Amino acid sequence: GSSSVPQDLQDEINKYGGKLKQTWGVPVEEIQRGIKHGVRKINIDTDNRMAMTGQIRKVLKDNPEEFDPRKYLKPAMEAMAKLCKQRLQEFNTAGQASKIKKVLTTAEMARRYSKGELDPKIA
């Protein structure tokens, strides 16, 4: 699945000195429709990077003397977290973490491989 590439995030990046060319993604409504029809992989990385970049540019434009990464990375991380929360709600996945099956640790996998428990079974 494709990112939505929100216009407001493009505008924010460009407002604070970015030079992103006009681009489009898949609207959230279309992604939601795809989910209802079986799409199970949704990309939001581009949206996350745009949210972070916009905040970093804003902080540095508003505070050109700033050089402490904590001063611009904190609002950038907050913007990304806000976007992720929004997408989890829009895609009806908020509150589903308890349904994720436990993943084996690498140490447990190594133990099970060495005992042959994970050997392929040919019928």
Describe the residue ranges of each PLM region.
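Catalytic alpha/beta core domains of metabolic enzymes, predominantly
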Residues: 1-37, 42-45
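C-terminal alpha-helical cap/extension of soluble enzyme domains
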Residues: 26-123
